[in-house]
A protein has these predicted regions:
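Primarily recognizes Gram-negative and organellar outer-membrane beta-barrels
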Residues: 1-189
């Protein structure tokens, strides 16, 4: 079994004046990978059929996940103690899950069943792709004894799943698109 993971984050903040105008730019990435191998043997004796079934099965499981995002925000003072903020983020994520099963049923000893290749009926390979856009617009009021904000967020998302190995590899699923939106209100005294 092997597992790897790597993540990173980069941020830049720049004040454009002393009244509250500023800009923020950020980026994130992540990668993880894992692989597991397993081996099993079974022997089944069928008394009524007077036969024996010997199965040796080797399974190689792999998964990996990759993601990255970029974001930017801009804050503008509009009048005393009040600021408008505009923020945008794009995020992409890809996930792979693969399980390749190699079978030796009665006649194929190890390692010959590797040469025959994996069993398509028992194996799978699925890739999922996700894209998310997020746009926020808000106004904030900051006072010595209280803080408040109101805004709205729009989040269009798309997802796609592709199966290239296994019994469902002939099914082509459509891309799914969703638009979420949410108002926000905050008051702190």
């Amino acid at each position: 079994s092997n597992n790897y993971s790597l993540n990173g984050n980069l941020m830049m903040f720049r004040r454009l004046n002393n009244k509250g105008r500023n800009i923020h730019v950020g980026a994130r990435f992540g990668y993880s990978d894992s692989e597991t191998d397993s081996y099993s043997e079974s022997s089944t004796e069928f008394f009524e059929l007077d036969s024996i079934s010997d199965i040796a099965r080797y399974t190689n499981r792999t998964s990996d996940s990759r993601n990255w995002s970029v974001s930017a925000s801009y804050t503008e003072p509009v009048f005393k103690n009040h600021f408008v903020q505009l923020r945008y983020e794009f995020a992409h994520r890809k996930q792979l899950a693969q399980s390749l099963v190699y079978d030796s049923i009665n006649k194929y000893p190890y390692p010959e069943y590797f040469e025959r290749g994996y069993d398509n009926e028992l194996s799978t390979k699925v890739e999922n792709f996700y894209d998310t856009h997020t746009a926020d617009l808000s106004i904030r009021g900051i006072h010595p004894k209280m803080m408040y904000s109101a805004g709205v967020s729009l989040t269009p998302q798309s997802s796609l799943s592709e199966t290239t190995i296994g019994p469902n590899s002939d099914r082509h699923l459509p891309q799914q698109n969703v638009l979420n939106w949410a108002p926000s209100v905050m008051f702190r005294y």
